[in-house]
Protein backbone atom coordinates (compact mmCIF):
# COMPACT_ATOMS: atom_id res chain seq x y z
CA UNK A 1 0.00 0.00 0.00
CA UNK A 2 2.88 2.35 0.79
CA UNK A 3 4.19 2.16 -2.77
CA UNK A 4 0.78 3.30 -4.07
CA UNK A 5 0.83 6.29 -1.70
CA UNK A 6 4.32 7.15 -2.93
CA UNK A 7 3.29 7.02 -6.58
CA UNK A 8 0.07 9.00 -5.98
CA UNK A 9 1.35 11.69 -3.62
CA UNK A 10 5.01 12.02 -4.67
CA UNK A 11 5.56 11.01 -8.29
CA UNK A 12 2.30 12.00 -9.99
CA UNK A 13 2.32 15.63 -8.69
CA UNK A 14 5.84 16.08 -10.05
CA UNK A 15 4.69 14.78 -13.42
CA UNK A 16 1.80 17.27 -13.33
CA UNK A 17 4.20 20.17 -12.69
CA UNK A 18 6.54 18.96 -15.42
CA UNK A 19 3.56 18.66 -17.75
CA UNK A 20 2.60 22.23 -16.88
CA UNK A 21 6.06 23.41 -17.88
CA UNK A 22 5.85 21.36 -21.07
CA UNK A 23 2.47 22.93 -21.93
CA UNK A 24 3.60 26.50 -21.18
CA UNK A 25 6.74 26.07 -23.29
CA UNK A 26 4.55 25.06 -26.23
CA UNK A 27 2.12 27.99 -25.86
CA UNK A 28 4.41 30.83 -24.83
CA UNK A 29 7.92 31.98 -25.56
CA UNK A 30 9.67 31.22 -22.27
CA UNK A 31 13.34 32.03 -21.82
CA UNK A 32 14.74 29.19 -19.69
CA UNK A 33 17.93 31.05 -18.84
CA UNK A 34 15.93 33.86 -17.21
CA UNK A 35 14.07 31.37 -15.03
CA UNK A 36 17.34 29.67 -14.09
CA UNK A 37 18.80 33.01 -13.02
CA UNK A 38 15.72 33.78 -10.91
CA UNK A 39 15.91 30.35 -9.27
CA UNK A 40 19.64 30.24 -8.56
CA UNK A 41 20.10 33.88 -7.54
CA UNK A 42 16.83 34.70 -5.77
CA UNK A 43 14.39 31.89 -5.02
CA UNK A 44 16.87 29.15 -4.06
CA UNK A 45 18.93 31.31 -1.62
CA UNK A 46 15.76 32.50 0.13
CA UNK A 47 14.42 28.93 0.29
CA UNK A 48 17.67 27.65 1.81
CA UNK A 49 17.83 30.55 4.26
CA UNK A 50 14.28 30.03 5.52
CA UNK A 51 14.56 26.23 5.73
CA UNK A 52 17.80 26.37 7.72
CA UNK A 53 16.61 29.25 9.90
CA UNK A 54 13.47 27.43 11.02
CA UNK A 55 15.17 24.30 12.35
CA UNK A 56 18.41 24.40 14.40
CA UNK A 57 20.48 21.40 13.31
CA UNK A 58 22.45 19.13 15.63
CA UNK A 59 26.16 18.47 15.11
CA UNK A 60 25.39 14.95 13.87
CA UNK A 61 23.21 16.37 11.10
CA UNK A 62 26.26 17.93 9.46
CA UNK A 63 27.62 14.43 8.82
CA UNK A 64 25.48 14.66 5.70
CA UNK A 65 28.14 16.86 4.13
CA UNK A 66 31.11 14.44 4.31
CA UNK A 67 28.78 11.57 3.37
CA UNK A 68 27.63 13.45 0.25
CA UNK A 69 31.24 14.35 -0.62
CA UNK A 70 32.33 10.71 -0.33
CA UNK A 71 29.40 9.65 -2.50
CA UNK A 72 30.31 12.22 -5.14
CA UNK A 73 33.96 11.09 -5.10
CA UNK A 74 32.97 7.44 -5.57
CA UNK A 75 30.62 8.34 -8.42
CA UNK A 76 33.37 10.39 -10.05
CA UNK A 77 35.82 7.46 -9.96
CA UNK A 78 33.18 5.05 -11.25
CA UNK A 79 31.94 7.37 -14.00
CA UNK A 80 35.52 8.17 -15.08
CA UNK A 81 36.22 4.48 -15.61
CA UNK A 82 32.89 4.07 -17.39
CA UNK A 83 33.40 7.06 -19.68
CA UNK A 84 36.75 5.73 -20.92
CA UNK A 85 35.03 2.61 -22.17
CA UNK A 86 32.15 4.49 -23.79
CA UNK A 87 33.86 7.20 -25.81
CA UNK A 88 37.28 8.15 -27.14
CA UNK A 89 36.33 11.82 -27.51
CA UNK A 90 37.64 13.79 -24.48
CA UNK A 91 34.79 16.31 -24.45
CA UNK A 92 32.16 13.56 -24.53
CA UNK A 93 33.94 11.64 -21.78
CA UNK A 94 33.88 14.79 -19.67
CA UNK A 95 30.17 15.25 -20.31
CA UNK A 96 29.38 11.62 -19.43
CA UNK A 97 31.45 11.86 -16.26
CA UNK A 98 29.76 15.12 -15.28
CA UNK A 99 26.22 13.81 -15.71
CA UNK A 100 26.91 10.64 -13.74
CA UNK A 101 28.84 12.16 -10.85
CA UNK A 102 27.88 15.82 -10.39
CA UNK A 103 24.96 16.19 -7.97
CA UNK A 104 22.29 18.78 -8.64
CA UNK A 105 19.27 18.44 -6.39
CA UNK A 106 18.40 22.13 -6.60
CA UNK A 107 15.62 21.61 -9.12
CA UNK A 108 13.73 18.44 -8.23
CA UNK A 109 15.19 17.74 -4.78
CA UNK A 110 13.12 20.34 -2.98
CA UNK A 111 9.90 19.36 -4.74
CA UNK A 112 10.39 15.65 -4.10
CA UNK A 113 11.34 16.13 -0.44
CA UNK A 114 8.39 18.45 0.21
CA UNK A 115 5.91 16.03 -1.37
CA UNK A 116 7.45 12.97 0.30
CA UNK A 117 7.41 14.26 3.87
CA UNK A 118 4.07 16.07 3.68
CA UNK A 119 1.95 13.07 2.61
CA UNK A 120 1.42 9.42 3.42
CA UNK A 121 3.25 7.22 4.23
CA UNK A 122 5.72 9.69 5.80
CA UNK A 123 3.03 11.93 7.31
CA UNK A 124 -0.22 10.91 8.95
CA UNK A 125 -3.34 12.50 10.42
CA UNK A 126 -2.69 15.70 8.52
CA UNK A 127 0.59 16.29 10.37
CA UNK A 128 3.98 16.54 8.68
CA UNK A 129 6.19 16.66 11.76
CA UNK A 130 9.37 15.71 9.91
CA UNK A 131 8.91 18.11 6.99
CA UNK A 132 10.67 21.24 8.41
CA UNK A 133 13.79 19.30 9.41
CA UNK A 134 13.75 17.32 6.17
CA UNK A 135 13.81 20.59 4.19
CA UNK A 136 16.58 21.94 6.43
CA UNK A 137 18.72 18.84 5.88
CA UNK A 138 18.06 18.98 2.16
CA UNK A 139 19.04 22.66 2.15
CA UNK A 140 22.47 21.64 3.45
CA UNK A 141 22.84 19.27 0.52
CA UNK A 142 21.43 21.85 -1.90
CA UNK A 143 24.13 24.29 -0.84
CA UNK A 144 26.84 21.65 -1.20
CA UNK A 145 25.37 20.48 -4.51
CA UNK A 146 25.36 23.97 -5.97
CA UNK A 147 28.93 24.63 -4.82
CA UNK A 148 30.14 21.34 -6.29
CA UNK A 149 28.39 22.03 -9.58
CA UNK A 150 29.95 25.48 -9.91
CA UNK A 151 33.45 24.30 -8.96
CA UNK A 152 34.10 20.58 -9.39
CA UNK A 153 31.41 20.22 -12.07
CA UNK A 154 32.89 23.12 -14.00
CA UNK A 155 36.39 21.62 -13.70
CA UNK A 156 35.18 18.22 -14.94
CA UNK A 157 33.14 19.44 -17.89
CA UNK A 158 34.99 22.54 -19.05
CA UNK A 159 37.85 21.98 -21.46
CA UNK A 160 39.60 25.04 -20.11
CA UNK A 161 42.09 24.64 -17.27
CA UNK A 162 40.68 25.87 -13.98
CA UNK A 163 43.03 27.28 -11.37
CA UNK A 164 42.36 27.01 -7.66
CA UNK A 165 41.78 30.76 -7.45
CA UNK A 166 39.19 30.71 -10.25
CA UNK A 167 37.32 27.82 -8.61
CA UNK A 168 37.43 29.63 -5.27
CA UNK A 169 36.03 32.73 -6.95
CA UNK A 170 33.19 30.68 -8.44
CA UNK A 171 32.42 29.28 -4.98
CA UNK A 172 32.43 32.74 -3.38
CA UNK A 173 30.05 34.07 -6.05
CA UNK A 174 27.43 31.38 -5.37
CA UNK A 175 24.33 33.11 -3.92
CA UNK A 176 22.96 30.03 -2.15
CA UNK A 177 26.11 29.87 0.00
CA UNK A 178 25.27 33.24 1.51
CA UNK A 179 21.68 32.16 2.11
CA UNK A 180 22.96 29.29 4.25
CA UNK A 181 25.55 31.43 6.06
CA UNK A 182 22.96 34.11 6.85
CA UNK A 183 20.62 31.46 8.28
CA UNK A 184 23.33 30.17 10.62
CA UNK A 185 24.23 33.74 11.61
CA UNK A 186 20.58 34.58 12.37
CA UNK A 187 20.34 31.47 14.55
CA UNK A 188 23.64 32.16 16.32
CA UNK A 189 22.77 35.75 17.18
CA UNK A 190 19.14 34.82 17.94
CA UNK A 191 17.68 37.29 15.43
CA UNK A 192 13.87 36.94 15.52
CA UNK A 193 11.98 36.95 12.22
CA UNK A 194 8.57 35.82 13.41
CA UNK A 195 6.24 38.76 13.75
CA UNK A 196 8.12 40.79 11.16
CA UNK A 197 6.96 41.47 7.61
CA UNK A 198 9.78 39.24 6.31
CA UNK A 199 8.46 36.01 7.82
CA UNK A 200 5.33 35.56 5.63
CA UNK A 201 7.34 36.63 2.57
CA UNK A 202 10.00 34.00 3.25
CA UNK A 203 7.31 31.43 3.99
CA UNK A 204 5.76 31.96 0.56
CA UNK A 205 9.14 31.40 -1.10
CA UNK A 206 8.79 27.69 -0.29
CA UNK A 207 5.71 27.35 -2.48
CA UNK A 208 7.21 29.57 -5.17
CA UNK A 209 10.37 27.48 -5.20
CA UNK A 210 8.45 24.21 -5.61
CA UNK A 211 6.33 25.40 -8.51
CA UNK A 212 9.00 27.42 -10.32
CA UNK A 213 11.68 24.72 -10.26
CA UNK A 214 9.34 21.94 -11.40
CA UNK A 215 7.78 24.02 -14.17
CA UNK A 216 11.21 25.21 -15.36
CA UNK A 217 12.39 21.60 -15.55
CA UNK A 218 9.32 20.82 -17.67
CA UNK A 219 10.25 23.67 -19.99
CA UNK A 220 13.82 22.32 -20.25
CA UNK A 221 12.46 18.89 -21.17
CA UNK A 222 10.22 20.42 -23.88
CA UNK A 223 13.21 22.27 -25.35
CA UNK A 224 15.21 19.03 -25.51
CA UNK A 225 12.93 17.74 -28.31
CA UNK A 226 13.27 14.14 -29.50
CA UNK A 227 16.27 12.09 -28.50
CA UNK A 228 17.77 8.66 -28.98
CA UNK A 229 19.07 6.48 -26.19
CA UNK A 230 22.48 4.91 -26.66
CA UNK A 231 24.81 3.13 -24.27
CA UNK A 232 26.81 6.30 -23.63
CA UNK A 233 23.59 7.85 -22.28
CA UNK A 234 21.88 4.85 -20.68
CA UNK A 235 24.77 3.47 -18.63
CA UNK A 236 25.65 6.78 -16.87
CA UNK A 237 21.93 7.23 -16.14
CA UNK A 238 21.80 3.81 -14.50
CA UNK A 239 24.87 4.70 -12.46
CA UNK A 240 23.17 7.85 -11.21
CA UNK A 241 19.75 6.32 -10.53
CA UNK A 242 20.61 2.80 -9.32
CA UNK A 243 24.28 2.51 -8.36
CA UNK A 244 24.34 5.85 -6.55
CA UNK A 245 21.60 4.91 -4.01
CA UNK A 246 23.33 1.56 -3.39
CA UNK A 247 26.61 3.36 -2.72
CA UNK A 248 24.78 5.73 -0.37
CA UNK A 249 23.38 2.77 1.57
CA UNK A 250 26.88 1.39 1.93
CA UNK A 251 28.30 4.73 3.06
CA UNK A 252 25.69 5.04 5.81
CA UNK A 253 27.47 2.23 7.65
CA UNK A 254 30.38 4.65 8.17
CA UNK A 255 28.11 7.20 9.86
CA UNK A 256 26.21 5.28 12.58
CA UNK A 257 25.45 8.44 14.59
CA UNK A 258 23.40 9.92 11.76
CA UNK A 259 19.69 9.77 12.57
CA UNK A 260 17.11 8.03 10.38
CA UNK A 261 15.76 11.22 8.83
CA UNK A 262 19.23 12.32 7.71
CA UNK A 263 19.80 8.87 6.22
CA UNK A 264 16.55 9.15 4.28
CA UNK A 265 17.59 12.55 2.91
CA UNK A 266 21.00 11.21 1.84
CA UNK A 267 19.33 8.30 0.05
CA UNK A 268 16.97 10.67 -1.78
CA UNK A 269 19.92 12.92 -2.62
CA UNK A 270 21.68 9.95 -4.19
CA UNK A 271 18.66 8.88 -6.25
CA UNK A 272 17.45 12.20 -7.68
CA UNK A 273 18.20 12.57 -11.41
CA UNK A 274 20.75 15.15 -12.38
CA UNK A 275 19.25 18.34 -13.78
CA UNK A 276 22.52 20.03 -14.60
CA UNK A 277 22.40 23.76 -15.26
CA UNK A 278 24.09 24.12 -18.64
CA UNK A 279 24.72 27.84 -18.16
CA UNK A 280 26.85 27.26 -15.05
CA UNK A 281 29.42 25.01 -16.70
CA UNK A 282 29.87 26.66 -20.11
CA UNK A 283 29.53 23.53 -22.23
CA UNK A 284 30.26 23.03 -25.91
CA UNK A 285 27.43 22.22 -28.31
CA UNK A 286 28.38 18.52 -28.36
CA UNK A 287 28.42 18.39 -24.57
CA UNK A 288 25.12 20.24 -24.39
CA UNK A 289 23.54 17.59 -26.61
CA UNK A 290 24.83 14.90 -24.24
CA UNK A 291 23.47 16.82 -21.26
CA UNK A 292 20.03 17.21 -22.82
CA UNK A 293 19.77 13.57 -23.82
CA UNK A 294 21.04 12.46 -20.41
CA UNK A 295 18.54 14.72 -18.67
CA UNK A 296 15.66 13.24 -20.65
CA UNK A 297 16.87 9.68 -20.06
CA UNK A 298 17.38 10.17 -16.33
CA UNK A 299 14.04 11.90 -15.91
CA UNK A 300 12.24 9.11 -17.78
CA UNK A 301 13.92 6.30 -15.85
CA UNK A 302 13.49 8.05 -12.51
CA UNK A 303 9.71 7.61 -12.80
CA UNK A 304 10.45 3.93 -12.14
CA UNK A 305 13.42 4.23 -9.76
CA UNK A 306 12.32 7.05 -7.42
CA UNK A 307 9.23 5.27 -6.00
CA UNK A 308 11.45 2.28 -5.22
CA UNK A 309 14.07 4.42 -3.45
CA UNK A 310 11.41 6.30 -1.44
CA UNK A 311 9.92 2.95 -0.43
CA UNK A 312 13.38 1.76 0.68
CA UNK A 313 13.75 4.94 2.76
CA UNK A 314 10.55 4.06 4.55
CA UNK A 315 11.58 0.42 4.93
CA UNK A 316 15.16 0.85 6.18
CA UNK A 317 14.92 4.16 8.07
CA UNK A 318 11.41 4.58 9.50
CA UNK A 319 12.05 8.03 10.99
CA UNK A 320 8.42 9.10 10.62
CA UNK A 321 6.78 5.98 11.99
Q: Language-model segments: what does each one mean?
A:
Residues 1-321:
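Alpha-helical transmembrane segments of multi-pass small-molecule/ion transporters
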